[in-house]
Amino acid sequence: MDFYYLPGSAPCRAVQMTAAAVGVELNLKLTDLMKGEHMKPEFLKLNPQHCIPTLVDNGFALWESRAIQIYLAEKYGKDDKLYPKDPQKRAVVNQRLYFDMGTLYQRFADYHYPQIFAKQPANPENEKKMKDAVGFLNTFLEGQEYAAGNDLTIADLSLAATIATYEVAGFDFAPYPNVAAWFARCKANAPGYALNQAGADEFKAKFLS
């Protein structure tokens, strides 16, 4: 199973943890966006949107990290704990995945990426929105072990990849005790977490040092 990725990318790390959780070995294909490797004709045939992560499973190409996570959990999961079949439980997992994509990860990008890639000054309004996003997650976690209940799901793996990026960027989790406790549980219990940490550290070394 080919996996086109960059280790520093939080979405790529979320897929790597999901693959570890379902026991699937990925054939890693480093894809350097800075060198334009995602624009090569052979890659565009696989993914005309030319983004990573991209997974190719026996000729079936799929991109968008959360779609890949769902695919891996449904096809290769040994049970439904990672992605529950119960409609309401699954709906909560989906909501958390969409929250990560549209709010938590996006607000990190909105605040940090203009500084990293365009050398713009920090935007206090975007910083507040980023903190608000972590506050939402802190509320979601009230009274439960994980993001969608008391079992670790693919939502936690996606969120943990994002929060690991917040961590290496120096975000202070002290005002968000539920997030801090949950993140410690993810570090201890998420399959493949070492890959996530290594990738987050690489992101820091490349873009935040």
From Swiss-Prot:
<feature type="binding site">
    <location>
        <position position="9"/>
    </location>
    <ligand>
        <name>glutathione</name>
    </ligand>
</feature>
<dbReference type="InterPro" id="IPR036282">
    <property type="entry name" value="Glutathione-S-Trfase_C_sf"/>
</dbReference>
<dbReference type="GO" id="GO:0018833">
    <property type="term" value="F:DDT-dehydrochlorinase activity"/>
</dbReference>
<comment type="subunit">
    <text>Homodimer.</text>
</comment>
<dbReference type="GO" id="GO:0006749">
    <property type="term" value="P:glutathione metabolic process"/>
</dbReference>
<comment type="function">
    <text>Conjugation of reduced glutathione to a wide number of exogenous and endogenous hydrophobic electrophiles. Has DDT dehydrochlorinase activity.</text>
</comment>
<dbReference type="InterPro" id="IPR010987">
    <property type="entry name" value="Glutathione-S-Trfase_C-like"/>
</dbReference>
<dbReference type="InterPro" id="IPR004045">
    <property type="entry name" value="Glutathione_S-Trfase_N"/>
</dbReference>
<keyword id="KW-0808">Transferase</keyword>
<comment type="similarity">
    <text>Belongs to the GST superfamily. Theta family.</text>
</comment>
<dbReference type="InterPro" id="IPR004046">
    <property type="entry name" value="GST_C"/>
</dbReference>
<keyword id="KW-0456">Lyase</keyword>
<dbReference type="GO" id="GO:0004364">
    <property type="term" value="F:glutathione transferase activity"/>
</dbReference>
<dbReference type="InterPro" id="IPR040079">
    <property type="entry name" value="Glutathione_S-Trfase"/>
</dbReference>
<dbReference type="InterPro" id="IPR036249">
    <property type="entry name" value="Thioredoxin-like_sf"/>
</dbReference>
<dbReference type="Pfam" id="PF02798">
    <property type="entry name" value="GST_N"/>
</dbReference>
<feature type="binding site">
    <location>
        <begin position="64"/>
        <end position="66"/>
    </location>
    <ligand>
        <name>glutathione</name>
    </ligand>
</feature>
<protein>
    <recommendedName>
        <fullName>Glutathione S-transferase 1, isoform D</fullName>
        <ecNumber>2.5.1.18</ecNumber>
        <ecNumber>4.5.1.1</ecNumber>
    </recommendedName>
</protein>
<dbReference type="Pfam" id="PF00043">
    <property type="entry name" value="GST_C"/>
</dbReference>
<feature type="domain" description="GST N-terminal">
    <location>
        <begin position="1"/>
        <end position="80"/>
    </location>
</feature>
<feature type="domain" description="GST C-terminal">
    <location>
        <begin position="86"/>
        <end position="207"/>
    </location>
</feature>
<feature type="binding site">
    <location>
        <begin position="50"/>
        <end position="52"/>
    </location>
    <ligand>
        <name>glutathione</name>
    </ligand>
</feature>
